[in-house]
Amino acid sequence: AMATGIGKTRLMGACMYYLYKTKGYRHFFILAPGNTIYEKLRKESNPNHPKYIFKGLEAEMGRPKVYDGENYDSYPVRYEQMSLQFEKSSEIELFIFNIGKIFNSKTDSQFSFHKFKETLGMSFAEVLSSFDDLVICMDEAHRYYAPASMKAINFLKPVLGLEFTATPKSANNVIYAYDLARGAVEGYLKTPVV
């Protein structure tokens, strides 16, 4: 649990880097709760952005390939001879989506993310669930405990789920906590001027 403004997104990038270097994991699915945070994550996945998620780690890990709710149809995979054919790569691959792009709890409908694609022989969600190293990083994780959200997340069969939030639903799975008061005292937060 980390206070807002401390740097949860950069910590998320550091966790992905660590798992890439120590475990060889390459597939990371970043889940945002809504459009505002989704757009922020898309921007911060660009190396030219001042708050680049992997700032300082580029020399060690290269430039990750980024796919999101707008461009995932360009993911280099095809269905041939009864199996998926992936482009060979040793780079990290990020998949950035918001919960609304993968599942609509109001209508219980699945979006194109879950729909069968002839070129894949399955849905894109099934492609992701086929990775044996898929890690889900949940921004504002306290928002995903509803049954419909959990269903959408579990469908992807992640090897690991990392939750990033300022307001954890339960203290049982908090690995690290850094609160607002400590962030202010240690100078990591801007003091508001009135």
Where are these regions (language model features)?
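RecA-like P-loop NTPase motor core of helicase/translocase proteins
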Residues: 1-194
